Design a protein with these regions (language model features):
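Short glycine-/aliphatic-rich beta-strand segments at the starts of folded cytosolic domains
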Residues: 131-146, 174-176
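Active-site beta-strand/loop microenvironment that shapes enzyme catalytic pockets
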Residues: 80-128
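Short amphipathic alpha-helices in soluble, non-transmembrane regions
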Residues: 152-158, 184-194
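C-terminal regulatory domains involved in ligand/effector binding and gene-expression control
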Residues: 1-78, 199-201
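Structural motif
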Residues: 28, 56-57, 95-98, 139-141, ...
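Conserved short beta-strand edge segments in small beta-sheet-based binding/regulatory domains
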Residues: 162-168, 192-201
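Short amphipathic alpha-helix segments
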Residues: 142-160
C-alpha cells in the first residue's frame, strides 16, 4: 500500500458568521505552519475584537495532524474549542487555525446551543475557504564526481525533483526535494550513477 504523501489546508484566510438568539459568532480561519504564527493571529484577533465576550479557537498543525489544541476561553468546558476542532477533523484539514469570536446577545444558549453555534460558525469559515492539496516533500543530498554530472542531470530531468542547492568543488554536491512517495525511486537511480553516493544527515 502506497504511503499517503498529501494533505489538505486552506489557501488564505476566510470568514464565517453565525447568529443565534442575538448572539453573533464570527469565525476566522487562518493558514498557519507554526505555534508562533498561531499566537500572532490570536493576539491580532484579541485586539481587533477587544469588546467580544469570548475569543475561542482550535488549531491543527503538520501533515501527520498530531499537533493540535482547542481552547474554550471561558465558555463551558467542551462547548467551543472542541466543536471548532471537530470541524477541522471532519474536513481533514491541517496547518489551520480557526478563531471564533462571540458577541453575547443577552440570551443564554445552553451547552448544546453553544456547541451547535461554534460548530456552525467554524463550518461556515471552512465552507468559504479555498481548500488546497499539498504534498509532503523530502530532501536528499547526493555527492558525485564532476564527469558524471550529465548522468545526474538526466535523472533530475526525468524524475523532476526541485534543486534546493548545488556546489561544484572537488566533489559535486546536489540537494534535491521531491514528494515523499517518489523519493525511493529517486534515491535508487541516483545511487546507481558511478561515483555517486547518498549523504545521510
Amino acid at each position: 500500500m502506497q504511503q499517503k504523501d498529501t494533505y489538505h489546508t486552506i489557501a488564505e484566510s476566510s470568514e464565517g458568521i453565525y447568529t443565534e438568539k442575538r448572539s453573533k459568532f464570527i469565525a476566522i480561519a487562518f493558514p498557519v505552519h507554526t505555534v508562533e504564527e498561531v499566537k500572532g493571529y490570536l493576539e491580532e484577533c484579541q485586539k481587533k475584537y477587544y469588546d467580544a465576550r469570548h475569543v475561542c479557537y482550535a488549531y491543527m498543525l503538520g501533515p501527520e495532524r498530531t499537533n493540535f489544541r482547542a481552547n474554550d476561553n471561558g465558555e463551558p468546558s467542551g462547548t467551543a474549542g472542541k466543536p471548532i476542532l471537530g470541524q477541522i477533523h471532519s474536513n481533514e484539514l491541517t496547518d489551520i487555525l480557526i478563531v471564533v469570536v462571540r458577541y453575547f446577545g443577552g440570551i443564554k444558549l445552553g451547552t448544546s446551543g453553544l456547541i451547535v453555534a461554534y460548530k456552525a460558525a467554524a463550518a461556515e469559515a471552512i465552507a468559504n475557504a479555498t481548500i488546497i492539496e499539498k504534498t509532503i516533500d523530502e530532501e536528499v543530498t547526493v555527492a558525485f564526481e564532476y564527469p558524471f554530472m550529465n548522468d545526474i542531470m538526466r535523472i533530475v530531468k526525468e524524475e523532476e525533483p526541485a534543486i534546493v542547492k548545488q556546489s561544484y568543488d572537488m566533489d559535486c554536491l546536489m540537494t534535491l526535494r521531491i514528494r515523499k512517495s517518489c523519493m525511493p525511486l529517486l534515491q535508487k537511480r541516483l545511487s546507481k550513477v558511478e561515483t555517486a553516493h547518498i549523504i545521510t544527515e
